[in-house]
Design a protein with these regions (language model features):
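Active-site pocket-lining segments that scaffold enzyme catalytic pockets across diverse folds
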Residues: 46-52, 185-190, 205
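Short acidic-aromatic active-site loops that bind/stabilize oxyanions
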Residues: 7-12, 33-36, 165-181
């Protein structure tokens, strides 16, 4: 299970504030609200906003660290969702890597990642290949899990040192290629494991 970044008392106060605010502005009674964890919310909007109801659908979420977790696998079947795997933010840190590279490239983390993604296609293979190899040495897919080859003590300083002197577009291109390959390999493994080929995805990493 994931780690909580707030105490139980903090979470209780936050929920009370949310309910009170919505009651005051919309007039919906508080007893009609049901709180769900971050990845359940991601999975729900991905599945229930999709056209898939008959048969089984894989519902995959990937993001930074919502409620202490960074990825989940669920199965949607006949309008119902069942969580079958959760991955902690300590084990899946692709979003954090993307965040740090955004910062290293002089942009605003948690806001300008889309600019890094937009910059990536401008780099040709001979430009991004060195950066790509740096990222490949970090995390890899092992079945349905993500693992570090050799976990750096500090990801930001690790990449700052390893990527020094490389072109900015090459860094963006290498990062995007690495992330796409990593996630595609994981998705293929999930499909192979459960035999379900219909997929919906949600979360910041798959945006």
């Amino acid at each position: 299970s994931g780690e909580h970044f707030y105490t139980d008392e903090d979470q209780r106060k936050i929920r009370e504030h949310i309910v009170t605010t919505i009651e005051e502005h919309i007039g919906v009674p508080g007893d009609r609200f049901q709180f769900v964890d971050h990845h359940t919310a991601h999975a729900a909007y991905a599945y229930y906003a999709s056209p898939f109801r008959d048969g089984q659908t894989l519902v995959l979420t990937l993001d930074a660290f919502g409620d202490g977790n960074s990825a989940s696998i669920s199965i949607g079947d006949d309008g119902k969702l069942e969580r079958i795997k959760t991955i902690s933010h300590r084990d899946f840190q692709v979003a954090r890597i993307y965040r740090y590279i955004t910062l290293l490239l002089g942009m605003k983390p948690d806001e300008h990642e889309y600019k890094v993604m937009g910059l990536a296609p401008y780099a040709k293979p001979q430009i991004y290949s060195k950066a790509y190899e740096v990222f490949r040495e970090t995390m890899y897919v092992d079945g349905l899990d993500f693992k570090f080859r050799d976990r750096p003590k500090d990801l930001y300083h690790h990449f700052r040192e390893k990527l020094e002197g490389l072109r900015f577009d090459g860094i963006a291109g290498g990062l995007q290629k690495y992330v796409e390959e990593l996630i595609c390999e994981w998705v293929k493994n999930v499909v192979a494991k459960y035999g379900i080929r219909r997929i919906v995805l949600a979360g910041g990493v798959v945006m």
